[in-house]
Design a protein with these regions (language model features):
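N-terminal, polar/charged subdomain of small-to-medium soluble alpha/beta proteins
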Residues: 1-97, 113-116, 120-155
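Short glycine-rich or small-residue beta-strand-to-loop segments that form or flank ligand, phosphate
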Residues: 99-105
Length: 155
């Protein structure tokens, strides 16, 4: 039986159902024994500030191309099957889901590594902009040095 391969990218304002996304990764996929997912959510604290929400913006068209390139690199490096990336944009409140990365593979090692790689590169290479609403006002956030360093470890 051949590896089940697919790539799906969704940039959306509406929330997603984690259980449904996992079920779609598993659907008609008897070859892959591993499904690894990451879900990022809006936290209520950042750098000592009380966060009340986020505004996420993106560069339409370019964001999807950037994510497709990141996934293509992951598919070259690891033996993975299906990949799904969902990233929300717009106004998000505390506890809401921001991002989903799901990866299937025959074995867990490839699925874990590819999932982490995709998320690390998404944080620094995909054109998203984040404005944080805090008890001290609103501010646009720059990419963190720690995110840059984490992504560079894959090079």
């Amino acid at each position: 039986m051949a590896q089940v391969e697919s790539m799906e990218i969704s940039i959306q304002t509406h929330d997603f159902n984690l259980s449904e996304e996992v079920a779609l990764l598993e659907q008609d996929n008897a070859i892959d024994g591993a499904v690894v997912t990451f879900t990022g959510r809006v936290r209520n604290q950042n750098n000592g500030n009380h966060v009340t929400g986020l505004t996420l913006e993106h560069y339409p068209g370019m964001t999807e191309k950037s994510l497709a390139k990141i996934i293509a690199i992951a598919k070259e490096r690891w033996n993975i099957g299906r990949v799904k990336v969902i990233h929300r944009i717009g106004e998000l409140n505390i506890g809401e889901q921001i991002v989903f990365v799901g990866v299937t593979s025959k074995h867990r090692q490839d699925a874990f590594a590819a999932n982490e790689f995709i998320m690390d590169y998404l944080k620094v290479q995909a054109p998203f902009w984040k404005k944080e609403r805090t008890n001290k006002g609103e501010m646009w956030l720059d990419a963190k040095d720690s995110d840059q360093n984490k992504a560079q470890q894959w090079d």
